[in-house]
Amino acid sequence: MDPCSFDIKVHVAAIGGGGGATHVLRAVAPFAASRTAIIAVTDTGRSTGLARQIGAMPAPGDLRATIAAFASDQVIAETLNHRFDGAGVPALAGMAFGNLLIAALTRVTGDFAAAVEHTARLAGASVRVLPVSVANTTLCAELVDGTHVTGEFEVRAPGKPPLARLFLGEPANAYPPALDAIRSADLVVIGPGSLWTSVLACVQFGGVVEALAHCRGTVAYVCNSTTQPGQTDGYRCIDHVQRIVAALGPGVLDVALINRSNPDADALRPYEEEGLHLLRPDEDEIAAVRALGVMPLVRELTGYVEPRRALWNKQDTIRYDTGALGVALHEVVMMKGKTNG
């Protein structure tokens, strides 16, 4: 995208996990006056889980990854993401240095948000990175059979009954500056990313739904490119949108951006072998989204499907083309939001 082709500059907030928010904020760079990432803090993965114990703090992993993605110093970025091999200290195997740094800063300052801010300043991050909450709480879920699971790792584990609802083990409020960023944004983008453990996890904190309802701009959801084993097995696009609307309440979500690309079968095969299936809406789904009071914006968002990446303790998915995503989100900006037109 040519930055000169955009004659307006808007304030953008992206809500979710580190990967999705990073992708969105890169995509909107040509037309963003400011960019804020509001990041999930309930991860309990191996590196993050241990760092949480060390720092007695919320999950730092997605925050660290987001800061590194926008670092002005590449050496600092690589250092934040550097994972120890455990040589001599097996307990540190796979530990990201940035997670330890945030844990240490939290212990020194007594303030998790300040620790994140110090880390972002050290990296020279070009976007504002905020935790959705500073509460050290646990993500829990009720399954359709009525049983409960505790901890983000268990919530996303495959091979269990479908998820019915999320809740926090210890109810907590959102971080006030994150709520301010949501309310003042011209565009709030929810997703893409793990529907339950990244996107809906952020909504569990007190104040997030209300802030979205009172956002001065447009609230958009970017639907995922594929299903995700353990979270959205068997889901269609409409199922994703319905979950978001159910969590936010009627009249809050303005736009659902949905991918309609149809990649080559050979490119899809490695993903399908891992249980991920392409999401493409049919006309009935598009009509159903509209019936929810949400504007469906269906666009081709994937170009060349890159080879699957080996992610630490996570599963890769098909990534959207940054340019195509940016053009589509600019379309969203040009639409009239619920309060700005």
Over which residues does each language-model region extend?
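Electropositive, gly/pro-rich neighborhoods at or near active sites that engage anionic ligands
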Residues: 42-161, 316, 320, 324-335
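An anion/phosphate-binding loop that grips the pyrophosphate of nucleotide cofactors and donors
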Residues: 185
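Glycine-rich oxoanion-binding loops at beta->alpha junctions
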Residues: 166-179
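Structural motif
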Residues: 13-14, 189-191, 220-222, 257
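Glycine-rich beta-alpha junction loops
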Residues: 41-45, 135-137, 145, 225-227, ...
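Hydrophobic/small residue at the entry helix of a nucleotide-binding pocket
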Residues: 20
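C-terminal functional extensions of proteins
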Residues: 2, 234-341
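Conserved phosphate- and dinucleotide-binding cores of soluble alpha/beta proteins
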Residues: 2-9, 26-32, 36-58, 158-160, ...
